[in-house]
């Protein structure tokens, strides 16, 4: 194998290993977005350990513990379980890390409505 091919293979291997690692989104993030019940202001406190995502979600109505959280490359997924008017409500999130300071999410509310939002790293 020529030196150029060896160097190219090493660069490709390094690039793939870096892209597979989960991004570190640990810390506080905030988002203001429109929902079926009006504008909402959320704070997300994320902690990443490998590909596992844990944390809390704080809303004007209280806090919820993040469930089923994963970070795989630039993809972020988790569930928010809460109670709305006395009924359990499951909200699933799937997002892409846009930059070190922004995550673009689509959240699905109880399998009914999709809502788009951008979370920004709190400063």
Q: Which residues fall in each region the model found?
A:
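Central antiparallel beta-sheet cores of small beta-barrel/beta-sandwich binding domains
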Residues: 23-98, 104-123
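Bacterial N-terminal signal peptides
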Residues: 8-17
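Bacterial N-terminal signal peptides that target proteins for export
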Residues: 1-8
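Bacterial Sec-dependent signal peptides at the C-terminal "C-region" and cleavage site
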Residues: 17-23
């Amino acid at each position: 194998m020529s030196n150029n091919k060896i160097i190219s293979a090493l660069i490709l291997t390094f690039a793939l290993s870096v892209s597979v690692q989960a991004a570190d989104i640990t810390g506080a993030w905030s988002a203001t977005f429109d929902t079926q019940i009006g504008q909402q202001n959320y704070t997300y406190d994320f902690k990443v350990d490998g590909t596992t995502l844990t944390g809390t979600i704080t809303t004007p109505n209280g806090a919820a513990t993040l469930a089923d959280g994963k970070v795989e490359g630039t993809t972020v997924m988790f569930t928010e379980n809460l109670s709305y008017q006395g009924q359990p409500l499951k909200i699933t999130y799937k997002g892409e890390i846009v930059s070190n300071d922004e995550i673009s999410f689509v959240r699905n509310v109880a399998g009914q409505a999709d809502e788009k939002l951008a979370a920004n790293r709190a400063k």
